[in-house]
């Protein structure tokens, strides 16, 4: 599937839930989904009979859009999760959570996953002391993500840290704000992911 270049708020309305694609704005009364919580288009308010397949597809699309992953890569993640020990759905979410761009967002060094992805590509962060510029890199327990001294005055990073102070950091991560440093304390567990996701629908979709 190609990149989706339409307005982010339309994505939220299409999926029927907030995807938090605009970072802190999604927590304010400026959120477009709060004003129009129905699908975009002329028939957005119409009630339709939805098939099981459509429900499964929408759930998959929702998760893809939350993490900013294209179809081919998402399918690859599912295959990897299916081959690993444990529950496939939980494995899939753990893989997505361990992406470097997501971890940077969770640590509060970016206001959204998209912003985190852009910052990573520009080489703003280091991983275990080395420059990391691949957003899809998988972090491991003990990894240290840091903003080098030269990049600490970037306005978007300072603004994002103010947001994370209000929003909080997941228990599997540890952030030292004054030092602009984050540590992966453990692997993410299913209960660490608070966003409403029914991963079983995705497993059913790909198992057909």
Curated annotation (Swiss-Prot):
Pfam families attached to this UniProt entry: Ribosomal_S4, S4
Location of the S4 RNA-binding domain: 98-161
Gene Ontology molecular function, alphabetical: rRNA binding; structural constituent of ribosome
Cystines in this chain: none
GO BP term, example: ribosomal small subunit biogenesis
Keywords from the named record: Ribonucleoprotein, Ribosomal protein, RNA-binding, rRNA-binding
GO terms under cellular component: small ribosomal subunit
SMART domains linked to this entry: Ribosomal_S4, S4
Signal peptide, first to last residue: none
Superkingdom of this protein's organism: Bacteria
InterPro entries: Ribosomal_uS4, Ribosomal_uS4_bac-type, Ribosomal_uS4_CS, Ribosomal_uS4_N, S4_RNA-bd, S4_RNA-bd_sf
CDD domains: S4
Record-stated family: Belongs to the universal ribosomal protein uS4 family.
NCBIfam families: PRK05327.1, rpsD_bact
Subunit structure: Part of the 30S ribosomal subunit. Contacts protein S5. The interaction surface between S4 and S5 is involved in control of translational fidelity.
Role, per record: One of the primary rRNA binding proteins, it binds directly to 16S rRNA where it nucleates assembly of the body of the 30S subunit.
Name the UniProt record assigns to this protein: Small ribosomal subunit protein uS4
Gene coding for it: rpsD
């Amino acid at each position: 599937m190609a990149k989706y270049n339409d307005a982010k708020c339309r994505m939220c309305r299409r999926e029927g839930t907030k995807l938090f694609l605009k970072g802190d704005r999604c927590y304010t009364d400026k959120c477009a989904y709060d004003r129009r919580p129905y699908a975009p288009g002329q028939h957005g308010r119409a009630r339709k009979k939805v098939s099981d397949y459509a429900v499964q597809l929408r759930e998959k699309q929702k998760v893809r859009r939350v993490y900013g992953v294209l179809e081919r890569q998402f399918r690859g993640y599912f295959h990897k999760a299916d081959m690993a020990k444990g529950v496939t759905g939980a494995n899939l979410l753990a893989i997505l959570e361990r992406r470097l761009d997501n971890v940077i967002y969770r640590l509060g060094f970016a206001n959204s996953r998209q912003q985190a992805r852009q910052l990573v590509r520009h080489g703003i962060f280091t991983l275990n002391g080395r420059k990391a510029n691949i957003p899809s890199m998988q972090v491991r327990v003990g990894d240290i993500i840091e903003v080098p001294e030269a990049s600490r005055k970037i306005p978007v990073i300072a603004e994002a840290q103010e947001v994370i102070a209000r929003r909080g950091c997941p228990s599997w991560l540890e952030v030292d704000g004054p030092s602009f440093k984050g540590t992966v304390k453990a692997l993410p567990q299913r209960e660490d992911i608070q966003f409403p996701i029914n991963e079983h629908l995705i497993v059913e979709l790909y198992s057909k």
